[in-house]
């Protein structure tokens, strides 16, 4: 079984959009997947669930429950450590790691996706960040970058930090969902040349799950090291 942690260069860069399309591609190809969202914030307009959790469940056509994919959720769409302190909730790396391991050890899966909250160094508390969880799990990362002004710096900084701690970058996805952005290809090419990592997928505004089928197959291939 392959395990992939999905992070963004920032919040609102399309992580959940990418996650749901990967889920749909896996379902279409009969690839057994589970996508976890251990920490979520921001309540949906349509239910009591957090919006990201709701979208993941919808992508699976509700064959999983919220408790099966999410451990900690907050209705306010703010940084997790802020609302956690306000709510007196402890976001423990050990508890998150245990939640994740419990989920995949009980299932026969081809791939486990773990969708993060925001960027690599999103704080869980004043003493721990999301990166601490990734390092504890020691699993590869898929990085989602929304192509816009500033994305080159954000993407390169994230890749450099992953490399510095010997965390494998399984791939990075260019989310090109804003048709008003100029020089999209030039920005992608710059990231590729400076980082040394080829863009795994360039996703347009009208992409659907079919655009993710090849990527989903690559992610579970034996050639990809965990």
UniProtKB/Swiss-Prot annotation:
The keyword ATP-binding applies. GO terms for molecular function: ATP binding; dethiobiotin synthase activity; magnesium ion binding. Pathway: Cofactor biosynthesis; biotin biosynthesis; biotin from 7,8-diaminononanoate: step 1/2. Substrate binds at residue 41. The keyword Magnesium applies. GO terms for biological process: biotin biosynthetic process. Belongs to the dethiobiotin synthetase family. This is ATP-dependent dethiobiotin synthetase BioD. It comes from Francisella philomiragia subsp. philomiragia (strain ATCC 25017 / CCUG 19701 / FSC 153 / O#319-036). The gene is bioD.
């Amino acid at each position: 079984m392959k395990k992939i942690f999905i992070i963004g260069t920032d919040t609102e860069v399309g992580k959940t959009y990418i996650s749901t399309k990967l889920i749909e591609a896996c379902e279409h190809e009969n690839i057994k997947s589970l996508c976890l969202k251990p920490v979520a914030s921001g309540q949906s307009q349509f239910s009591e669930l957090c919006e990201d959790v709701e979208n993941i469940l919808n992508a699976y056509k509700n064959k999983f429950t919220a408790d099966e994919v999410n451990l900690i959720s907050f209705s306010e769409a703010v940084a997790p450590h802020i609302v956690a302190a306000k709510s007196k909730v402890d976001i423990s790396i050990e508890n998150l790691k245990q939640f994740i391991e419990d989920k995949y050890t009980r299932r026969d899966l081809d791939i486990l996706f773990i969708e993060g909250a925001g960027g690599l160094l999103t704080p869980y508390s004043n003493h721990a960040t999301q990166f601490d969880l990734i390092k504890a799990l020691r699993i590869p990362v898929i990085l989602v970058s929304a192509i816009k002004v500033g994305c080159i710096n954000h993407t390169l900084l994230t890749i450099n930090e992953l490399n510095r701690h010997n965390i494998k970058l399984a791939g990075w996805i260019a989310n090109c969902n804003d048709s008003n952005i100029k020089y999209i290809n030039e920005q992608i090419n710059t990231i590729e040349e400076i980082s040394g990592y080829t863009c795994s997928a360039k996703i347009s505004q009208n992409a659907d799950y079919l655009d993710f089928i090849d990527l989903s197959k690559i992610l579970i291939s034996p050639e990809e090291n965990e």
